[in-house]
């Protein structure tokens, strides 16, 4: 059973996004600057669209935090939308005079659904005759709220269990970074300074070249991000039920990110291509205790963390808003046409890594709270230490 609960609300061009996180203990350090720093990281990356140049995330805590520390009550965060004045009438909650709306170009019905987006299926499911009510919520803008919550979860993980999370881009279109090179928390500043958040300089240049070519071609690109969690204790998650397995929870959280179409834990799909003798992590006794000789499993076995480096990958498809517009129909006329196009990114894979960090942080925070409990950070910290000091097999 989950210990933490989180929800987000709001639309892409609404006044703000709102996020709530329930279940954290008192005493987790968090400030608006800490949240804003991670939101700024979400805007990073070569190939982003025009919105990233002027989008600013105005962070306000609405509850659950006092003087930089959580209170043990639900944490509520608002991420303001600096573009709201342009959309105040189009996205108004209360009715607006139809005559006013008729004169607004932004309010034109979006009747040409975009392939790869939620537009058409959402219109059919909810009974809308245009895509605006669907795309506003389906937009990846919503991930800003999850990154905000992830900032709180990260602080909780570091304060209670010493867990730190890093991501990097390992593939972007045909360009790939060398396999098996894992950044550490000490590399975050260097990663964030790289245009595509790739640790390998040669691979980074190749990725930038891929983005430049896609821009010239009027196309978009996807890629693969890898998230690593350091100092994760053994025993998070459980083997006893399918929905308590940590790898299942991680996969679900990552698949819930817009445009993510595949997830693997550890060596994932590669393990299906090798014999069992080369697929598993052998166990040895070392001066530091019981360890695995390799990290093929990605730090989980049987739904539980092993105490080794936790490693997951997520594959992001190319952005569906393609500049050269894909074929669709106009639902108002039934005629064949080209999909609606608005400003968009050529590539958002580097930003997807930041969102993936947030989702991994939230899942791990839930697992830590589930395993160790505690109504305050010191209590949870004591519980973690006691557990690790008293492991039967160490």
Curated annotation (Swiss-Prot):
Recorded GO CC terms: cytosol
One Gene Ontology term from the biological process aspect of the record: aromatic amino acid family biosynthetic process
Manner of cofactor binding, per the entry note: Reduced FMN (FMNH(2)).
Keywords associated with the record: Amino-acid biosynthesis, Aromatic amino acid biosynthesis, FAD, Flavoprotein, FMN, Lyase, NADP
PROSITE patterns xrefs: CHORISMATE_SYNTHASE_1, CHORISMATE_SYNTHASE_2, CHORISMATE_SYNTHASE_3
Role summary: This reaction introduces a second double bond into the aromatic ring system.
Name of this protein: Chorismate synthase
UniProt source species: Streptomyces avermitilis (strain ATCC 31267 / DSM 46492 / JCM 5070 / NBRC 14893 / NCIMB 12804 / NRRL 8165 / MA-4680)
